UniProtKB/Swiss-Prot annotation:
Keyword line: Chloroplast, Plastid, Ribonucleoprotein, Ribosomal protein
Positions of transmembrane segments: none
PROSITE patterns named in the record: RIBOSOMAL_S15
Pfam families the record matches: Ribosomal_S15 (PF00312)
Organism classification: Eukaryota, Viridiplantae, Streptophyta, Zygnematophyceae, Zygnematophycidae
Disordered, as annotated region: 1-20
A biological process from GO: translation
Protein name, entry field: Small ribosomal subunit protein uS15c
Location of the protein in the cell: Plastid, Chloroplast
Amino acid sequence: MNQNLSIRKRNKLKQDSGSPEAQISFLTLRVLQISSHLKMHTKDYSSKRGLRKVLGTRKRLLSYLCREDVSRYNKLLNNLGIRAAKK
């Protein structure tokens, strides 16, 4: 439910779920959920591995978006409140 609301807020079209912006915003929500879970369950190694996988996927999508359109990349970083990836 939160995922759909987040995607709709960040995208122009309601049915847009395949754009890099939509995917990155979905993955950012996922990162926040897993991070809050790990604060309570520090020894949950499966979740730590899942967090690393999600972060890697988000990093690849961010680098793709940076290559393709820097203005969209910068706007997305400001909207989501995340740092730029190291180059």
